[in-house]
Amino acid sequence: MLWNARSLNNKLHHLTTELLDGELDAAFITETWFKTQLNNCTATLKENGFSISHFHRDNKGGGGVAVIYRHNFKLHSSKSYSFDTFECIFASISGNTSQKINFIVVYRFCELSPAAFLLEFRQFIESTFIHKKNLVILGDFNLHVNKVSEPDIIQFNEILSTFGLSQLIDQPTHVSGNTLDLLITNKNETEIKDIVIDDINFSDHSYIFFKISCELQKSKDKVISIKTYKNIDMDKFKNDIVSKVNIFSGKNHVNFGDALNDYNALCENAVKDYVFAKSINVTESRPKWMDSEYTQVRTHRRKLYKRWVRTRNEEDRIAFVSAREKTHLLSIEKQSKFYRDTICNAKNSQKALFSICNHLLDMSKSKVLPSHTSPIVLANKFNDYFIEKIEKIRQGFRVLTRPLMDGLDTYLGPVMTEFALVSPECLKKIVLSKPIKSSPEDPLPGFLFKNCLDQLLPALTELVNLSLSTGSMEGLKDSIITPILKKVDSDSELLKNYRPVCNTLYLSKTIERTVLVQANDHMDRTKAHTPNQSGYKPFHSCETLLLKVTNDIFTNLDNSKCTIAVLLDLSAAFDTVDHDELLSILWSQLGFRGTVFQWFENFLGGRKQAVIIDGHKSEFRNNRYGVPQGSVIGPFLFNIYVRDLMRLMEEEGFDAHGYADDHQFLLKFQIDFQATAVRLTIPSTLDLIGKWMNRYFLKLNPSKTQVIIFHPDSKHSDISFGQLILSNGSRVQISNQVYNLGVTLDSNMSFSPHISASISQGYGLIRNITGIRKYISREHLKTLVNSIIIAKFDNCNSLYVGISAYEAGRLRKFQNACARLIYGRNKREHVSDILRELHWLPCEARTYFKIVSYVFKCLHNLAPIYLSELIVIKQLQDFTLYVPRTLTSYGDRAFSCIGPRLWNSLPIDIRLINSLDCFKSKLKHYFFNSFTEYKAELNKYKTS
């Protein structure tokens, strides 16, 4: 079927009904008007047994093309193209024979002239025709082909004739009486028959039904093996675990590998008597909300449609339209009742709510894989690709590693030679400190492990202590990797668009957490932590790092100084770490010796990995580099590995900051007389960084490395750095805005690009949730909006202090739109009353709330050192802070200035609170009731 939907969002029910009742195999849609890759439309299609591949416009509304096809058909490739005059999507569907049909769905923009389109279309067809056979070109061409004497139509027909193509539609397809929707093919290659044009639908374009003589290749039903845990007698199971643990403990293990084998056997033997595996066929089924009443109404609707097609009687048409509307309303009623009952039956749990939301918005984590005939072959391809990718990067380095214990004589601090053994109570705290997420390779699923933790604790304690005392992790070093598509709109056929994700065994995570606690304690005692490295550290986050960076930028701008920032981009940084270099740092710089060093050496060495697809594992391959995927201690080790880079940049006069593999370096300068020196310094510094990274087997990507200069508005015309050229000929462009840890920073610190992007994304979420709000109660809708939209809206909003009134107004309007979404109000209705009912703070108050919360954390040792040192207590008795003097509004926006000002304006009873939760509660209540009076107090504390 071909159809110009003119917004599929509000016509999807009718399209789905047409697909199901007409037993259609595929639909080709133009003007979908989709705004995002995933929404409730794509979710509804998938729920009804169809897949969709579509192209949407990012920069403006309207347009969009899509191919919809049954789940069990194999769409071999799908690519979208956008030209100046039209957009299209290409899809290739194979038959059971070698025949392959290549569909191209086209939508021409009517804003541009037909002559421009014909020129582009000829070039497109010429390039496509050479490489593809069995072409079917269809879509809305916005050409009146029924007016055969017009010059544009004559030229269009000549183009088709040149390539042996025929246009098959000879009836009007638009309410205006013109033929706009076309079906084009080579009759000698592809036979199209039984073309029917149906004008009863909800668009100004007709349905075009047709048949193609081709037996499509269908996927076989998937057979999966599942285990059922529902009927376990937990008391009996726990008693069985206790008896097996007693046998385990009586063996007095001295070898970690033997103990691990016995533990796995213990768990497997305990489970096998209670859990049974069975194989089931995964077949298509109708949505769960479809009951017999709805099925009868839909069947009646179909009968009325067939009667009207047969008679073309006006009374039959009216009866069909009435039945169609009744079916539509009943489907909404049934879905609403089903989803609301599901949430209520789950005792209003947020987990059930978000599961339904993900399902309705097509946000569920479904596996997308390249087309394949054998999962094992594909798994081996992925494993080879992931290994060889790192091997190729490593081969680009021509460096001889230094001896393993190089630097031994230079370390004079305390050493750590052995781990302290843990008690069962201590281990239980470590286990419960994080959510229990098990791997499919674990001998016990997560919920059983949690329920039986007390019974398993003696065996777990023995295993953990054996690992710590012997320095062994043997048996826990095989990684099982799942390939995950990096971006939803990436080409799923290319292996480079996938990232390896490993879900580590839970026992390994537990041992690593125990090691991490003691290793961090040692580094705290020896003051070995890098203060400005914020990744994977308590009280540190992207927002704390950005607060520090923007504080320094604002302070420099306040003193009429510019700041140049270099944001590095590394290729596969975690995966190219050299084990010998890392072990050398652990030994010579941090003082890890004896059994502790042996544990790290054993943990890193002898690792293997395999890829799993649909339960089929590839062959294991040796993994000689990198910190282990999915490990708890891997990020900690990476921070250690790059610690010298931070020191190197500080020695060069830069302020260095890092978050995992994202590193940035800032340098302040006077534009009047230091600009030339800085322009020469940055390339040499990047060369120095490149040499250091080459030395440590890290690959710097100059083309993606970002450089930006933050400058006062008055100095904008004085800056003309242009491109920076490195010694190897690489060029680094100086940008006006950069993407830094999730926030777009612009050169004059207006945050306008970031706010625009955030609001655009937010309105997309509002649009999606609007499509499903009819299925969810208001209370549940509040939870969704707060968790999905407002949480993202508040992300890094502490940086918004001092933004322009225009930007503040945009944020306020967006917040109002969120409130209207919950209460179903239109855009012209006031929202003051519902904002109070929702207990939402105004946008400015939300920013102040976040900043004051960080000040509280700084004063109570709950923040990074680099933030805490910006806050100075002035008077201890009333807990007031020193407010530094500033010269411009830039200085007023710095955290070191605005933080104390906001703090000093609070009532003393709030400032003296010691509990963070209590402080936030009192602060929100105060802001909610007295924010206007609070703002009036701010002017009293401009400077100290």
Indicate where each model-derived feature is located.
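Short phosphate/oxyanion-binding micro-motifs
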Residues: 1-132, 145-150, 154-165, 176, ...
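Short, conserved micro-motifs composed of acidic
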Residues: 42-45, 151, 172-196, 417, ...
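Conserved pre-catalytic core of RNA-dependent polymerases
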Residues: 85, 386, 417-628, 667, ...
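Arg/Lys-enriched, amphipathic patches
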Residues: 101-106, 112, 134-148, 211, ...
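Catalytic palm subdomain of template-directed nucleic-acid polymerases
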Residues: 143-154, 572-590, 664-690, 802
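Surface-exposed loop/turn segments and immediately adjacent short secondary-structure elements
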Residues: 211, 215-217, 240, 251, ...
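Basic, alpha-helical interaction scaffolds
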Residues: 232-269, 729-799
